[in-house]
């Protein structure tokens, strides 16, 4: 039930090859979160669909939140605070998008630009709000379970520029009549220049962009499964195994004593069919 930890009346999670889907029901309100990675662009969409099964009009406030790094996982793990010092943010009001870039420390370092935007299908109320300062969003001594910007009902500060700990946060307020559903798609896109990232923002700032990404993701998933000759159940097992290989989960690792006993010279690998001619 992340991030709030509040148990709903009903909850369900479905992972498929093309998307992840989270469904929860709280009273008369049902929320569906669909997460899809675009096959054609460096873009991810998280669409929130809110349905009102009650007898009265509801006004719902939706707030996104993501912590920014714009660096490799290794660089962030080694020096997380230092890595984030070089991120600058700005807001492009005409597109309703937050932009962020990492200041290069040398001309040889490649540019990295990211953008975050929201596309609303339904009736909006109030003005869009943004935040790019993590401290202002979370508050002193708080975390994502109880951020002050959400729990206290205060507006976002619309802070941009050079911040010590950057985030992407967008807020939209929607009005949902009885028996109706409103969709809000939160897009995050990445490119190698400001011009390119603005082009991606323009491309995805449309209500049809989600359907296109969903169709392409499903099609690509079916083609991959057919090409590999595996069914969805087998693909799920392979992905779980790949996760342990890529991220080296400690729970799957033998004890240090077992690893030391397995040490030896390269000839010890030859009996296993591993050599310079047949590398891993």
Residue ranges of predicted features:
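Anionic coordination/interaction segments
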Residues: 1-280
């Amino acid at each position: 039930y992340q991030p709030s930890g509040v148990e709903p009346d009903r909850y369900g999670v479905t992972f498929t090859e093309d998307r992840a889907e989270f469904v929860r029901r709280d009273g008369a309100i049902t929320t569906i979160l669909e997460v899809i990675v675009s096959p054609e662009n460096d873009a991810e969409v998280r669409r929130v669909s809110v349905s009102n099964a009650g007898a009265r009009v509801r006004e719902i406030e939706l707030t996104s939140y993501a912590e920014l790094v714009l660096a490799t996982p290794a660089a962030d793990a080694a020096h997380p605070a230092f890595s984030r010092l070089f991120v600058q943010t700005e807001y492009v009001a005409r597109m309703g998008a937050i932009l962020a870039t990492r200041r290069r420390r040398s001309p040889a370092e490649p540019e990295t630009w990211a953008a975050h935007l929201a596309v609303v299908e339904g009736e909006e109320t109030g003005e869009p709000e943004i935040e790019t300062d993590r401290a202002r969003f979370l508050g002193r001594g708080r975390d994502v379970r109880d951020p002050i910007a959400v729990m206290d009902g205060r507006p976002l500060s619309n802070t941009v520029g050079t911040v010590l700990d950057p985030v992407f946060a967008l807020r939209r307020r929607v009005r949902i009549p009885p028996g109706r559903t409103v969709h809000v798609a939160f897009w995050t896109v990445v490119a190698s220049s400001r011009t390119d990232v603005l082009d991606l923002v323009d491309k995805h700032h449309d209500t049809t962009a989600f359907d296109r990404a969903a169709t392409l993701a499903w099609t690509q998933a079916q083609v991959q499964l057919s090409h590999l000759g595996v069914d969805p159940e087998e693909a799920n097992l392979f992905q779980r195994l790949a996760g342990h290989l890529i991220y080296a989960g400690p729970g799957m690792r033998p004890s240090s004593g077992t690893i030391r006993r397995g040490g030896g010279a390269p000839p010890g690998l030859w009996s296993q069919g591993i050599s310079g001619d047949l590398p891993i």
